[in-house]
């Protein structure tokens, strides 16, 4: 039996799964505008605060605390979304901890896994540089790492406090002793990283760090829905697919941005499929919107031409898999550089 804590519970029961509905975490999304430059300019501190808020809300999911107090498990799998406090799940249950991350291997994960740092050979995601890095770029790499490490150190007391707040009562109710945060944080059995040599720097990894970039891509891509297939078939010049993903919503763009985008897209000789979350007035005839689109099916279609996105690691492997041409519009802190 697997207990699955998810913000997207299935409509029907699944054999062998005990579902805990964590959709309460989605309540924070309307208050988070990734197009607001005040948030973007906060850089990674904004992202880490967002991650901690998600961790706090997840603990409020109905049935989660009971599962932690009364359940018996052999391992814990968590996805790391910039919140180190989730180390508490395995610490409370006293079982091996398997962690999945959403980005490539970075110095903070090297530190957590006690691996030799690659600062002199591998550019940070904030440091676009050729490889091998020239001296000034290596110096810049070290400086940026020092700044990021200092920023995390300044927030460490917040992390420790939240770790104790969320997990100390659960550990006490279970009858176990919550270990100090460092003991829990470094006790990772396996780390899966969202990385692959096709889009990330080659680097040495310890045996318990495994690259799984592109794991979410299905080998058998389903056909397009009939309405989209008919649309692509009737587009002799081809189709441009425009998507900002799920967190960064096109509907939240400023009005002037949406107006200018419609003007530019309307002048193109291509059909444009735009993932847009609400109705959009004044659309040119060649611009078609949907709140959701089967992007893998679109990118693999012979009529597809260009994929416009914000450099998300969930989106790029799909485009690499089919050899899609990408036009990147970096926006969120981890993609803007």
Language-model segments: what does each one mean?
Residues 1-337:
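Catalytic core of nucleotide-sugar-dependent glycosyltransferases
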